Structure formats: structure tokens, C-alpha cells
Amino acid sequence: MSDKVIVTCALTGAQQGKEANPNLPEQPREIIEQALDAARAGAAIVHIHARDSRGKATADVAVFREIAEGIRAKSDVILNLSTGGAVAGLPLEERLRVLPELKPEIASFSIGSGSLLGRYDAAGRKWLRDQYVPLVPSYAEMETAARIFRDNGVRPELEIYGTSFLNNVWHLREAGVLEEPLLINLVMNIPGECIPWSPKNVLFFVESLPPNNRWVVTAIGGKVHFLSVALSVAMGGHVRVGMEDNVYIERGVLARSNAQIVEKAVGILHAVGREIASPAEARQILGLRARV
């Protein structure tokens, strides 16, 4: 267990938008501003998706570049860029273009197949069950992607949505294409082919991971979001919060910003006697190269 806890803030995601919470950032200027505020509130890492001018998910490197450069100019917070983005049908090489083009320290890497339900209808309080986000990497694609990460000096954050993904972590590790310590994100509570959040499920997944790892839980939804903070830190993990995963600060009350959510998470950590890691300390914990 690390002495200090890394807080990741997932700023915007690729699914719900301002229809779910008008304070959710969509455009580059909004994302940059909220990233900087989240870093000041205690986030050592910001996880970033890009949106086009209509608020739809995009893998456009130019949009990612605008966001990344705007943050890097004012903060040493660690950037974790999405390579998924819910851009259906986009070829692997297009999704991975941010790696050689922008050289983020971390980027997300989905290592399994399945379908996740799409946008949330806030007015109707229901998920639109006819919209799917397919995750269909083959073993060959996963190994190719892992090598692209490695060759560009980008640490993959391995996204685990279900039990079959665990086998893929072990496979890629044994294939020698992953750098350690492994960065693991246990994604829970997304409707579709995704594991529900519960203490028992978190325990099972954590105990099933290869050794020498650093893990967080993505706990979707206001009912479990902050419970997950307390559970994860008690089990030796790190913490992920933010408006990608939860748009509420408390039951029925929309969050004003990502920074407000980070502040609440930091308060939980301090209440149980844990300190938060700075970006520099997070780099040491994760085995990342120092930023120059």
C-alpha cells in the first residue's frame, strides 16, 4: 500500500453531456479550466475525452492537442488521454494517434470485448438501450496496441469491464508487452456487459490481478461513487472521481464542477487519515518518468 493516494479526475467522458448536468465540460476551454481547477483541488491525474463542437465524442488529435497544451502550459498535472472515446467503428490506428502525436504520460487502453449502453436520457431518467459502444479488440490488436504504447513511452491504463478482461491482462503481461507496475482501472456499474459495483466484486477483481500493480475503481453513478472512494483506499487502491462517472455531489444535487467532486473525495481521504499524492509523487508511485 502506498503511503499517499493518487486522485484521478475523469472530467467529461464520451456519453452523457450537458443534458445530464449543465456544468459538465464539453468544449476545450471548459475542459482546460475544469482540469486546472481539479488539479488545484487535489487531483494528480486528469483523464480526458475530447468532444466536437456539437458535444459528441471525437478522436480528433487537434482537439486533444488544444486541451493538452492548454493544461500543460499551466500545470504539471498528469494527463491520461482516452483512446476509446465511444467513437464507434473507428480503426485502432486512428484511436491510437494521440500516442505518437501528443505523448501523454498515460492513456486508456480497453483490453477486452463487449458492448456498453450509450447515452443517458436525463429527462426520462433512463439509458437509451438502442445505443451501444462496442469494444472489440482482438488479441492481435491488443498486442499491437500495447507495443505502440511502449514504443511511444506512454503507460497504458488497462480498462477492465468484466471477468474475461482479467485473462487478457495476464496474457499481455506474459507476452512481455506491458511495463510494470501495471496501471489498472476496474470499471463498474455501466449498464451492459459491465460488472456491477459491490465490495465483493471489487475484492474479487483486486485479488485476481497480477502482482506489481496500481489500481483504481471507476464506480459509475451517484449511489456508489463516493462509497467507492472509501472502499478503494481501505483496500490499498487509488481513487478516481469526476463528472464522467457521476454528475452529482450528493443525492439529487448536481455537482457545480469537477473540482467540487475532487474536494469531496479529498475530504473523505483526509477523514480516514490518508494524504493525497502530488503529481510528482504520483509519477514516483506509478513508475513514470519525471516530467521535463
Task: Describe each region flagged by the PLM.
Residues 11-33, 83-91, 131-136, 157, ...:
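Active-site mouth loops of central-metabolism enzymes
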Residues 9, 56-83, 145-149, 204-212, ...:
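Alpha-helix-loop-beta-strand connector modules within alpha/beta enzyme cores
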Residues 58-136:
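Active-site beta->alpha loop and helix N-cap motifs at the rims of alpha/beta catalytic domains
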Residues 106-243:
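Catalytic alpha/beta core domains of metabolic enzymes, predominantly
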Residues 19, 44-66, 187-190, 247-251:
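Glycine-rich, proline-tolerant flexible connector loops at the mouths of alpha/beta enzymes
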Residues 31, 38, 49, 107, ...:
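Conserved, mostly hydrophobic/aromatic
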Residues 1-23, 115-125:
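N-terminal small/glycine-rich loop or linker at the start of catalytic domains
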Residues 117, 121-128, 250-274:
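C-terminal helical cap(s) of enzyme catalytic domains, especially alpha/beta-barrels
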